[in-house]
Curated annotation (Swiss-Prot):
Entry-linked Pfam families: MIOS_a-sol (PF21719), zinc_ribbon_16 (PF17034)
PANTHER family: GATOR COMPLEX PROTEIN MIOS, WD40 DOMAIN-CONTAINING PROTEIN MIO FAMILY MEMBER
InterPro entries assigned to the protein according to its UniProt record, in alphabetical order: MIOS/Sea4 (IPR037593), MIOS_a-sol (IPR049092), WD40/YVTN_repeat-like_dom_sf (IPR015943), WD40_repeat_dom_sf (IPR036322), Zn_ribbon_mio (IPR031488)
UniProt keywords, alphabetically: Cytoplasm, Membrane, Phosphoprotein, Protein transport, Repeat, Transport, Vacuole, WD repeat
Name listed for the protein in its UniProt record: SEH-associated protein 4
CDD domains listed in its UniProt record: mRING-H2-C3H3C2_Mio
Name of the encoding gene: SEA4
GO cellular component labels: cytoplasm; Seh1-associated complex; vacuolar membrane
Oligomer status and interactors: Component of the SEA complex composed of at least IML1/SEA1, RTC1/SEA2, MTC5/SEA3, NPR2, NPR3, SEA4, SEC13 and SEH1.
Originating species: Saccharomyces cerevisiae (strain ATCC 204508 / S288c) (Baker's yeast)
Length: 1038
């Protein structure tokens, strides 16, 4: 088995030294590697020493550059300088200094690579000389053996010249022999050991820990030996003793393996602690990996296992498997809770508790890899140098996986590789269009549930549904024609799966873009925004949901869903259908009111009459007039938008046919029970196919009263399962069996359409079953359009929870839920969504949108009696009176606490004294006229507590806060002289009105305390720098 070993402390340039032993174990090669060059050209072969017997071990000196030791199976140890100009052949057997004329076995790269190798050798030697590093230019070659010649299993060289040999067992000679090369007699090939240990044992592995300590392992024991002591510091019985390797980042830890390939990681502190207690059975490895390096690993002991500690990252090692896979293991650790970590040194942290945090597999570039080692690169990067079983050396880069991946609040992805100080960023740079909410026209004046859209998300057969997902503008027309080929090609993969594209279409980016456009602050504006914005995930169900909310809000605002003590705002179909049970868990009526089913029906009838006022139409459910739930059914039809008259039918048909959707118009005619109208609609279509279908449907008029089965019914059933258009399918399904459930079971038909059919034609029992079953389905699936069924109620919150779990669209959930909570009910999930969305708006720095959201929430929480149910945070800034130091926005109070807080000067004023002194009010009860005068509202330009006038404006001398000023304060806002009030639209006029109102607000200088109207301050400091108050030299604008 071959060997590659990284050499430390030899190179003082930017190159790294490596020593290798070929798989046949008969030659040693010295390489230099450029760590920053990933090509195989970076591997430069400098020297190769051949003609060894069977190499069993190899080590090098960290202090003597070029000095290596090679142990052989025949018991000889050869020590020579591999970096010298000439490396001797082992056949000479000559001492140091006598082999200058011997033949050198050196293999250099041919051509330019050979010249490069020669330059490197010379440059490195000169560089070391100039920097003062000792370099031995003497070529030496020493061959020695133990007194009892036997196989050398392991070898170690420390920085002081001590050489340790681990030998096979011998009854009369020690197996661990340590000798000093500095005092060796070159005329003898037998060594004279200075220290000897482990008689009648076979040492299979050893490693110098420092100048005096060595870690040795026999086939049965692990031992730490201090050469200054005749006895080991400890010896631990174990069979996991082969190939000791120290952790380069923590020399307390080392690894070994056993004959069956089981790998163990040890901590010397743990072994020494147990030895000091006299208990050898308690000590155990920190981690054990069963058969990790393969069974029969001990038979490969003459080199080393396919195990390497990482020299780049702490707590990482790599293993080779099957010659084609390298696994990189990363360890984590946790400390004992009863130990004070701060008291430990950095190198002595309590890491006895290790665990595997992650494992990453890397496939080798070529198969039949025999061994490998790490190549450290700058910035904590790494690659691998590998040797195949043929002896070929090649370099393999490693694609670093991300140890940290964090998305920021703008959905840019930050990536960090391991402990790399550099951070990669995938930034989302797409700039979406901006929108001004004031420019979106609303049509809420006459909006009602009957105005729900008829288009929805239907696309007739033969037409492609527009894709609201990722738009691929890079595709040309030719590429569109061959889209299948593009998808299968590499270019197509890169095109459709760019990280930037994926991040742009992530829900967090979509939510941020929606928020910047004012999404959800006004339902009808939201519908218009969805229609005009092409870059968002504007699914039809989102649009239809917001349109229903807009109509429900208009009904709440104009009071058409309120009757007496009953408020059915934003209530869904199933809540109304279930009556008292449907609204019992909500605050729909006053708490002191006991509402019965009979009273509820009366209130619902009042709501129906109020909504049907000035509407002359017949009831669409005359066949259910005798039902005990007739009132609920009629109100459910209103809520769902299906309370239509005959004239409304015709308008709906014309709108749908104008859009070219004749199939849908015919299906709506069937939903209204008008089969002849459906035939007429399809017969008027331009497509011959639809006219033929109209002929087939016309057979219903002839066969509807015939009992039994016939060929026409069979053909209709067949077409109902074979046609692609869902509306044609339900038409044929219904006329074949005259069963409305065929329409209700069709999932391709929208929920609102199926709901309209059920409310019109099902009896009470079947309708209850349908509503319960459908509501359970939409809640479980998180179908947002199902809010028309559940309403914004506790059941609706369950639906929104499923929707959030499916889409992560917490924005829509928060904005929708505030229409019902906390006005009608409270739910902790709503509070969590609201807080999450507020935090998101703050992280996106959309503070104005967050303020609008808070204002909208407080408005929607106000009940019909004017009570705010939301927990509104109090204002943090207010204006206080300079006289009494109280908030001028709070109403005056007659409590004793207010009297205490009022300044002493106010008590001299008789009016203030009478108002605030409780004793005076107690005894002076006869002064009714004074009390009546005291209860009169004060002017807006004086303090409501003490009656002091507000400061006057330094420009106009009018008291600040005065309403209905006799002049207009324009401020410094520029206005187009050609633009008149008539030419401005409603939104601009409202904006100008708000600006003029803002110009009348208070404005104070914090230095001189002089005040002005905000608009007057703008006008004054647009031309001046000094305060307008006479005698004041304050520069207020600075």
């Amino acid at each position: 088995m071959g060997l590659i070993k990284k050499v430390t402390h030899w190179s003082y340039d930017n190159l790294i030294d490596y020593l290798s032993v070929n798989p046949t174990r008969d030659e040693v090669t010295h390489y230099k590697v450029d760590p920053e060059n990933e090509s195989d050209e970076s591997i430069i072969k400098l020297h190769t020493v051949k003609d060894f017997g069977s190499i069993t071990c190899l080590d090098y000196s960290e202090s003597e550059i070029g000095m290596i030791g090679v142990g052989e199976k025949n018991g000889y140890l050869r020590i020579f300088n591999i970096s010298g100009q000439n490396s001797s052949s082992p056949a000479s057997h000559a001492p140091v200094g006598l082999n200058a004329n011997n033949e050198t076995s050196m293999t250099n790269a041919s051509g330019g690579k050979a010249a490069q190798a020669e330059n490197i050798v010379g440059s490195v030697s000169n560089l070391k000389d100039t920097q003062g590093y000792p370099v031995s230019e003497t070529n030496y070659d020493i061959r020695v053996r133990a007194k009892k010649q036997r196989c050398i299993n392991s070898l170690g060289i420390n920085t002081n010249g001590l050489i340790a040999m681990g030998l096979d067992r011998n009854k009369h000679d020690s197996s661990l022999q340590i000798w000093d090369m500095n005092y060796h007699d070159d005329s003898h090939e037998t060594i004279n050991p200075m220290f000897s240990y482990c008689t009648n044992e076979s040492i299979v592995s050893l490693k110098f820990l420092n100048d005096t300590s060595v870690l040795a392992a026999s086939t049965k024991f692990l031992k730490e030996i201090d050469v200054r002591s005749p006895n080991p510091i400890y010896q631990h019985p174990t069979r996991l003793t082969y190939d000791i390797k120290l952790n380069p980042f923590n020399d307390w830890q080392f690894s070994t393996y056993g004959d069956d390939g089981t790998l163990a990681i040890w901590d010397r502190r743990k072994l020494s602690d147990q030895a000091s207690l006299g208990d050898l059975n308690v000590a155990s490895p920190l981690l054990t990996f069963e058969k990790l390096v393969g069974s029969g690993a001990a038979s490969r002991k003459y080199m080393n296992s396919c195990f390497r500690w990482s020299c780049v990252r702490n707590n990482e090692f790599a293993t080779l498997h099957r010659g084609d896979t390298i696994k990189r293991w990363r360890l984590g650790y946790y400390c004992d809770s009863n130990r004070d970590i701060a008291a430990d040194d950095d190198n002595e942290m309590n890491i006895e508790n290790l665990f595997v945090s992650s494992v990453h597999d890397t496939n080798t570039m070529y198969d039949r890899v025999a061994t490998f080692d790490y190549i450290p690169r700058s910035n904590n990067g790494t690659s691998l140098i590998c040797m195949r079983q043929s002896g070929t050396i090649y370099r393999m880069p490693i694609s670093e996986v991300c140890s940290k991946a964090i998305l920021n609040n703008r959905n840019s992805l930050l990536l960090s590789n391991f402990e790399n100080t550099e951070i990669d960023e995938i930034r989302v740079n797409n700039e979406h269009e901006k929108s001004n909410l004031e420019n979106v026209k609303t049509i809420l004046k006459n909006l009602s549930f009957e105005d729900l859209d008829v288009s929805e998300d239907y696309f007739p057969s033969g037409h492609d549904e527009p894709n609201n997902e990722i738009e691929y503008s890079e595709l040309s027309e030719e590429e569109n024609e061959g889209s299948n080929d593009v998808l299968d090609s590499k270019r197509g993969f890169e095109l459709f799966w760019k990280p930037e594209k994926l991040l742009e279409k992530d829900i967090s980016v979509i939510m941020r873009t929606r928020a910047s456009l004012g999404y959800g602050l006004d339902p009808m504006n939201t519908v218009e925004m969805i229609d005009s914005s092409k870059n968002l995930q504007n699914n039809a169900y989102i649009r239809n949901t917001w349109r229903w909310i807009a109509i429900a809000k208009a009904s709440v605002d104009d009071g058409t869903m309120v009757s007496g003590d009953l408020d059915l705002g934003y209530e869904g179909v199933i809540g109304i259908w279930n009556g008292i049970n449907g609204i019992s868990n909500q605050d729909r009526y006053r708490q002191e009111t006991i509402l019965s089913d009979k009273q509820l029906n009366k209130e619902m009838e009042k709501i129906i009459k109020l909504r049907r006022k000035n509407r002359d139409r017949n009831s669409p459910i005359a066949n259910a007039a005798g039902s005990p739930k007739y009132v609920q059914r009629r109100l459910c039809l209103i809520i769902s938008g299906w309370d239509l008259s005959r004239s409304d039918y015709e308008d709906k048909y014309n709108i749908i046919m104008k859009n070219g959707h004749y199939e849908k118009a015919a299906a709506w005619a069937v939903f209204f029970g008008d089969i002849p109208k459906a035939v007429e609609i399809l017969g008027s279509a331009k497509k011959e196919r639809l006219r033929l279908i109209a002929t087939a449907i016309a057979g219903y008029l002839a066969y509807k009263d015939l009992p039994g089965n016939n060929a026409w019914r069979q053909q209709c059933r067949k077409m109902s399962s074979e046609l692609d258009d869902p509306y044609l399918r339900v038409i044929f399904a219904f006329i074949a069996d005259n069963d409305w459930w065929d329409i209700l079971y069709e999932p391709a038909i929208s929920l609102r359409e199926r709901l309209g059919v059920a409310l019109r034609f099902l009896n009470d029992t079947d309708l209850t079953t349908f509503l319960d079953r459908t509501s359970s389905t939409v809640i479980e699936n998180g179908e947002l359009e199902g809010l028309i069924l559940t309403g914004i109620t506790p059941n609706g919150i369950d639906l929104l929870q499923s929707y959030v779990n499916k889409t992560s669209d917490v924005q829509s959930a928060a904005l929708i839920s505030i229409f019902g909570s906390p006005r009608y009910f409270r739910d902790q999930r709503v509070d969590e969504w609201i807080q999450t969305y507020r935090d998101m708006l703050k992280s996106w720095e959309l503070f104005s949108m967050r303020a609008r959201f808070d204002v909208l929430r407080s408005k929607l929480s106000r009940t019909k009696t004017g009570v705010l149910t939301a927990d509104i945070k109090p204002r943090q800034i207010y204006i206080q009176c300079q006289n009494c130091k109280q908030n001028i926005n709070t109403p005056r109070t007659s409590s004793p606490s207010s009297a205490v807080s009022t300044s002493a000067g106010n008590y001299k004023n008789g009016e203030a004294y009478r108002r605030n002194n409780a004793d005076y009010k107690k005894f002076n009860t006869g002064s009714s006229e004074a009390q009546a005068a005291d209860e009169k509202p004060r002017h807006k330009y004086c303090c409501p507590h003490c009656g002091s006038s507000f400061p006057r404006c330094a420009i106009c001398l009018m008291p600040l806060g005065t309403s209905n000023l006799p002049f207009v304060i324009n401020g410094t806002q520029s206005r187009d002289p050609m633009q008149t009030e008539d030419s401005q639209d409603g939104a601009n006029r409202e904006l100008v009105s708000r600006k003029l109102k803002l110009n009348e607000w208070f404005s104070f200088c914090l230095s001189c305390n002089h005040g002005m109207h905000a608009g007057h301050a703008e006008e004054w400091f647009d031309r001046h720098n000094v305060c307008p108050t006479p005698g004041c030299t304050c520069q207020c604008n600075k």
